[in-house]
């Protein structure tokens, strides 16, 4: 049964990500989920996500990080060993993985690289394998895919008592969909070799997402795409675990101008991705549509450039020490 609009029960990010609290929706008290609104399926999410990538600088933002910071991280890996072990958690179709491998090869010429991948989506695994088949300069690099979720991988490791260690583990934009964030971070951190590094890429607290989620998540359908979290939630977990870390902030933008053009298909996909809702513009109450579109134009969410509305998609790159 839907909670009364006066007081909504929300799952909010906290140190343990477990406590449900009653949260006052403040001035949005008349806005709430109606039966016609539903969350995106996995396939619909992929389609909406592609629209996001097509109109955002997310990958360019990661490329800047790869250029400015990653060479220094990679140079410190391996501790003189002849083989460097990498684990990608939720690697998707592998584009970012291969870019990082190239940086590692440049930092450690001739070193063998054992790259393992945890990715539950079979389409993504197939696309990753195809990318590897087409890629040049992968001599000395081995690939092992685990078609599992991160929690399934953890369970398998514990059941078989095969706790393999890695020199570099990365979790790029995937912790939103993890059931138990603190224990997931704790487990994969325990998989690091001495002097290893854990890279977590997550939305920054300076992003428009942080402002949008604080005000409107109670108005949207619950989704198994997971937690509404930003970098502050992750660094709080790391501090509680006593893990040393450094945060690198990189600006990223997303052109959402089409969100405000009635009937625009790309704008519809963008609103679906923003809200995690299938056909948000066609199913949400008019008051919610209006309020959300108005919020997207506010300075805490977006800026204007050459007549376009650019949503703030800033990323935090968190590098944790072993």
Swiss-Prot record:
Transmembrane intervals: none
**GO BP, sorted A to Z:** carnosine metabolic process; methylation
> Which Gene3D superfamilies does the entry link to?
Vaccinia Virus protein VP39 (3.40.50.150)
Query: Where on this chain does substrate bind?
Result: 58, 313
Listed under catalytic activity are:
carnosine + S-adenosyl-L-methionine = anserine + S-adenosyl-L-homocysteine + H(+)
Q: Indicate the enzyme's highest-level EC class.
A: transferase
> Domain of life, per the record?
Eukaryota
The protein's Enzyme Commission number = 2.1.1.22
Which positions in this protein are listed as binding S-adenosyl-L-methionine?
A: 90, 119, 150, 172
Q: How does it assemble?
A: Monomer.
Additional remarks? Two different proteins belonging to two different protein families are able to mediate carnosine N-methyltransferase activity in chicken. This protein, which is not conserved in mammals, and another protein (AC F1N9S8), which is conserved from human to yeast.
Family under the similarity heading = Belongs to the class I-like SAM-binding methyltransferase superfamily. HNMT family.
| Role played | N-methyltransferase that mediates the formation of anserine (beta-alanyl-N(Pi)-methyl-L-histidine) from carnosine. Anserine, a methylated derivative of carnosine (beta-alanyl-L-histidine), is an abundant constituent of vertebrate skeletal muscles.
Spell out the protein name for this chain.
Answer: Carnosine N-methyltransferase 2
């Amino acid at each position: 049964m839907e909670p009364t609009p006066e007081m909504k029960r929300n799952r909010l990010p906290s140190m343990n990500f477990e406590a449900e609290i009653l949260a006052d929706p403040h001035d949005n008290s008349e806005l709430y989920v109606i039966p016609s609104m539903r969350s995106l399926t996995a396939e619909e999410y992929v389609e909406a996500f592609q629209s996001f990538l097509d109109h955002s600088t997310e990958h360019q933002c990661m490329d800047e990080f790869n250029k400015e910071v990653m060479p220094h991280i990679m140079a410190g890996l391996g501790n003189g060993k002849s083989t460097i072990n990498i684990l990608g958690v939720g690697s998707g179709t592998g584009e970012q993985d291969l870019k990082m491998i190239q940086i590692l090869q440049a930092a450690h010429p001739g070193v063998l690289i054992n790259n393992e991948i945890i990715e539950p989506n079979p389409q993504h695994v197939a696309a990753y394998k195809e990318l590897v088949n087409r890629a040049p300069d992968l001599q000395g690099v081995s690939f092992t895919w685990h078609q599992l979720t991160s929690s399934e991988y953890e369970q398998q490791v514990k059941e078989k008592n095969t706790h393999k260690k890695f020199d570099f583990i990365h979790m790029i934009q995937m912790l939103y969909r993890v059931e138990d964030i603190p224990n997931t971070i704790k487990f994969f951190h325990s998989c690091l070799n001495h002097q290893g590094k854990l890279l977590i890429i997550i939305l920054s607290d300076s992003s428009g997402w942080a402002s949008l989620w604080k005000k409107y998540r109670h108005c949207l359908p619950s989704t198994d795409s997971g937690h509404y979290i930003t970098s502050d939630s992750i660094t709080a977990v790391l501090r509680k675990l006593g893990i040393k870390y450094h945060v690198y902030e990189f600006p990223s933008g997303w052109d959402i101008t089409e969100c405000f053009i009635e009937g625009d298909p790309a704008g519809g996909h963008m609103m679906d991705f923003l809200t995690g809702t299938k056909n948000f513009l066609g199913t949400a109450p008019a008051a919610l549509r209006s309020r959300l579109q108005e919020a997207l134009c506010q300075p805490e969410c977006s800026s204007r450039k050459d007549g376009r509305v650019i949503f703030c998609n800033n990323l935090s790159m968190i590098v944790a020490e072993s």
